[in-house]
């Protein structure tokens, strides 16, 4: 019987603080990302090749309203193994400019970089693009309720999101 052997290295206890949530998201059309460069170990992104003149756009939102969740799907019987990543965002105050952007995002095939609350950048779309899988516009009922658009971007890739070297971000975003 053949076995799928992997080199295991272990994970030691990390005693540093680990903050939940995300701070920002950077989006581009997936087709405009022509390639990524990995470090020598093949585990961290150290560069992007973009279409001429194209950069990732920054999407900002209020604190504690965005998240990134990656879920492994594995089936030993079929040999299936992939990771679904969902990036959920809330943009407060419904208005025309945001409605237009939400409509564009709902129809786009996207490349996604997420900045988490620990200051680490993650590229969620190394193998396949992300697309809108859910969204809403809501006014709320009471004065204190949220008035906002929400959007979930979903991608399916061969592995969990790749970390992006922070030095690269300034060269590929605007």
Question: Positions of the model-derived regions?
Answer:
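N-terminal alpha-helical "arm" segments
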Residues: 1-23, 170-174
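Generic structural motif
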Residues: 11, 16-18, 30-33, 64, ...
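Solvent-exposed edge beta-strands and adjacent loop segments
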Residues: 13-84, 129-143
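Generic detector of bulky aromatic hydrophobic side chains
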Residues: 15, 108-109, 149
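Well-ordered beta-strand positions in beta-sheet-rich domains
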Residues: 58, 121-123, 150
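Structured, beta-strand-rich domain cores
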Residues: 63-127
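Mixed-charge, glycine-accented linear interaction segment located at domain edges/termini
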Residues: 128-174
